[in-house]
From Swiss-Prot:
Name under which the protein is recorded: Small ribosomal subunit protein uS14
Gene: rpsN
InterPro entries: Ribosomal_uS14, Ribosomal_uS14_bac/plastid, Ribosomal_uS14_CS
Annotated keywords: Ribonucleoprotein, Ribosomal protein, RNA-binding, rRNA-binding
GO CC annotation, single: small ribosomal subunit
Organism: Buchnera aphidicola subsp. Cinara cedri (strain Cc)
A GO molecular-function annotation: rRNA binding
Leader sequence residues: none
Function (record text): Binds 16S rRNA, required for the assembly of 30S particles and may also be responsible for determining the conformation of the 16S rRNA at the A site.
Gene Ontology BP terms: translation
Amino acid sequence: MAKQSMKAREFKRKKLALKYFLIREKLKKIVKSKFSSEKDRWNAMLKLQTLPRDSSPSRQRNRCRQTGRPHAFLRKFGLSRMKLREAAMRGEIPGLTKASW
């Protein structure tokens, strides 16, 4: 089970990423555009660097919804492998069956 502070930190990162998403995209578009001047690119880079570090989506970590575990996370279900197995054995995930051959 992950610490509550780690879960809260991830929640804060998601909120910041949503808050600054449009600003970040606009600045990145200016930086990548071949039609913008060097001065505009430079200013956009400086503004990007002044944004909060946690507002970048690459700082986020996928975590299990039930336990907050960061490793062995399965995107399709939003759970870690252990919690997915437990839920599958209880029959809580429709269409998911244990493999046998």
